[in-house]
Regions:
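A short helix-breaking turn/cap at a secondary-structure junction
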Residues: 1-60, 82, 136
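Acidic/polar loop patches that form or flank catalytic/metal-binding clefts of enzymes
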Residues: 3, 13-20, 73-80, 120-128, ...
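Glycine-rich, small-residue loops and helix-cap segments
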Residues: 3, 7, 67, 148-241
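Short helix-loop capping/hinge segments that flank enzyme active sites or metal/cofactor-binding pockets
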Residues: 27-49, 100-176, 181, 230-238
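Solvent-exposed loop/turn segments at secondary-structure junctions
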Residues: 50-53, 81-85, 99, 109, ...
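Short helix-loop-beta junction
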Residues: 57-75
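Short glycine/threonine-rich loop-to-helix capping motif typified by GTGT followed
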Residues: 57-60, 87-103, 202-210
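Short connector loops at secondary-structure junctions
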Residues: 73-94
Length: 241
């Protein structure tokens, strides 16, 4: 199932120019390579910088590592990744710049999605209209939390803005050439593994989300697909690898 999903994620999307950067895969391209002994001889790097946030999740990670080793994989442990600190300045903040990119792209993509809806009334709407609707119906739409992310995104300009382009180039270099690519090359790896995310957390209407740890950001910022398979459960909540 994960191989089929990865094939779709990495496949061609005519609405997404980024998918033109590589040859298109069909949903069955990767499935053909899923074999019972597929891990034998593969070098798997354990990304420890994306683990160590939750003891019970870490225990499941160790069990998964033992299982892969028993299946013939060569485990390369102790892989660490740190963001580059000198792309544009000594205090370069990759995650801050990545959030800046996210806000630009969220506004652009949401407006494009709305414009493509078949309902003409909805197709005329924009992020600005959604913000105003929420303000007009705050009691129903925002009883607990506000819409700060919407408002931050609305303040951004088009994707032709120099600030967006510079931020995108910087974060992709940090996550690609100086991140995933470098780790794979330096350690001669076939793949990197880490816990996907912590177990689900309780809803907190005062403090909001309480997410701790996870490995999705590096793949998301780089633009590479991130594949998750079940690793186990913690207190009945699923966690992935």
């Amino acid at each position: 199932d994960a191989a089929m999903m990865l094939g779709v994620m990495a496949g061609l999307d005519i609405a997404d120019p980024a998918t033109n950067e590589r040859p298109a895969w069909s949903p069955t391209t990767l499935v053909r390579h899923v074999q019972a002994d597929g891990l034998r001889g593969k070098r798997i790097g354990v990304l420890r910088s994306s683990a160590g946030f939750h003891g019970e999740v870490d225990q499941l990670l160790e069990e998964a590592i033992d299982s892969m080793r028993a299946s013939g994989a060569q485990i390369v442990d102790g892989i660490e990744w740190q963001t580059s600190q000198n792309l544009f300045a000594e205090s370069y903040d990759m995650f801050g710049q990545a959030y800046n990119v996210l806000l630009y792209e969220f506004k652009h993509d949401l407006n494009a999605y709305l414009a493509g809806l078949p309902n003409p009334d909805l197709a005329e709407m924009s992020l600005a209209d959604l913000i105003q609707f929420n303000r007009n119906h705050a009691d129903q739409e925002m009883p607990w939390f506000k819409q700060e992310i919407f408002e931050l995104a609305q303040a951004k300009g088009p994707l032709s803005d120099e600030n967006y382009i510079d931020a995108l180039v910087g974060v992709q270099k940090a996550a690609r050439e100086d991140g995933i690519d470098k780790l794979l090359i330096d350690h001669e790896l076939d793949a990197l593994i880490a816990p996907t995310a912590p177990p689900g957390w309780s809803i907190d209407l005062i403090n909001g989300d309480n997410s701790l740890g996870g490995s999705s950001s590096l793949a998301a910022i780089s633009g590479y697909p991130n594949m998750t398979v079940p690793m186990g459960q913690v207190h009945g909540m699923p966690v992935g690898l």
